[in-house]
Amino acid sequence: MSSKQNLTTVFNKESGEIHLGGIDALVRLTLDQVRTDERRGLKTGMFVSGYRGSPVGMLDAALIKQQKLLLEHNIKFVDGLNEDLAATAVWGTQMMHTVGKQKFDGVTGMWYGKAPGVDRSGDALKHANYTGIGKN
């Protein structure tokens, strides 16, 4: 990241070139998704959960650091106790379309974990795929 850029600028800039590392790019990705949906006329949110011990273990710290900005864009981060519980929590957000009145047109779910955690989370991941998601 250039010394002339701070993280607030990097996360808020919507045109031109930005320079950031991989973890910050994942944080930025959440904002870009919600902004893209907004430009399409949709009111969406995002739910992110994962395990702190994953290879992207600093993602949780970066999301917590930007929590105020993320909440302003309807992006909620919840630490997972383990990969299985985190995957199940994300799956829950994808069932919004099956209940009555919703606050959002859709919720994007983002899960992260490590390889053994993927094995452990098989049921949640399979059932989430079988259940499907809402239109947005």
Predicted regions located by residue number:
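Thiamine diphosphate
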Residues: 1-136
